[in-house]
Amino acid sequence: MFAIIETGGKQYKVKEHDIIRIEKLNASVGEEVTLSKVIALTGVNNEVIFTQNASVTASVLEQCRNDKVIIFKKKRRKNYRRKNGHRQYMTVLRITKINNME
């Protein structure tokens, strides 16, 4: 059984005991988090169910930062060069339970 959840403007396909990296959530390490925006999940015979009341419970493993992305701007023949870096804050979650409340 898997679920498709949405958080941080992105969609993730998750199963129980999966580890995912998502955009930063305001939660401390070890805390349980409930993700209530479930788009779809599968039933007994792997049929897709679209439900409004489902939720996914996850525990926070760590708060970290993603790899650095380099931004480089240049205008030719004008000696204009700008180099900048960015590291996005991430939250690592372990999916503990998929709640199907039909």
From Swiss-Prot:
Entry coiled-coil feature ranges: none
GO MF annotation terms: rRNA binding; structural constituent of ribosome
Entry keyword set: Ribonucleoprotein, Ribosomal protein, RNA-binding, rRNA-binding
Top-level taxon of the source organism: Bacteria
Family annotation (Pfam families): Ribosomal_L21p
GO biological process, one term: translation
GO cellular component: cytoplasm; ribonucleoprotein complex; ribosome
Role, per record: This protein binds to 23S rRNA in the presence of protein L20.
Subunit comment: Part of the 50S ribosomal subunit. Contacts protein L20.
Entry-linked PANTHER family: 50S RIBOSOMAL PROTEIN L21 (PTHR21349), LARGE RIBOSOMAL SUBUNIT PROTEIN BL21M (PTHR21349:SF0)
Annotated family: Belongs to the bacterial ribosomal protein bL21 family.
HAMAP family named in the record: Ribosomal_bL21 (MF_01363)
NCBIfam families, A to Z: L21
Listed name of the protein: Large ribosomal subunit protein bL21
Source organism: Ehrlichia ruminantium (strain Welgevonden)
